């Protein structure tokens, strides 16, 4: 079996990630990466945060490399509709233009639904 390439989309902003790291010893995306690697150790995992324009640009330019995309949970609220939340929604909308399989968890599902 060939390697699987997965893109994990972090659902927390840096401040919320710090709280998560204190509680769980890793970010939401890192914890999810560890689970994926336990299930399939040969998986290549890339983690991005949609608030980082350079990361999203690179991910979208290389979308054909990924077998799947996972949108993690997070602590943000769609009703707040901050600039960062809008970037998450825009990134998800752009992901739907490609044929990748998508798994969206909690916050990630809200973002994908809004996209």
Residue ranges and their predicted role:
Residues 1-90, 94-98:
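N-terminal beta1-alpha1 cap of cysteine-dependent amidohydrolase-like domains
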């Amino acid at each position: 079996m060939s390697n699987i390439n997965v893109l994990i989309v972090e659902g927390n902003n840096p401040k919320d990630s710090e709280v998560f790291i204190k509680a769980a010893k890793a970010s939401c995306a890192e914890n999810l990466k560890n689970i994926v690697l336990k299930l399939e150790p040969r998986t290549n995992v890339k983690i991005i945060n949609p608030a980082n324009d350079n990361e999203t640009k690179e991910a979208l330019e290389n979308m054909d490399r990924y077998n799947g995309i996972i949108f993690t949970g997070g602590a943000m609220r769609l009703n707040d509709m901050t600039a960062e939340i809008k970037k998450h929604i825009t990134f998800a909308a752009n992901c739907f233009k490609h044929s990748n399989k998508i798994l969206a968890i909690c916050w990630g599902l809200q973002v994908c639904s809004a996209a």
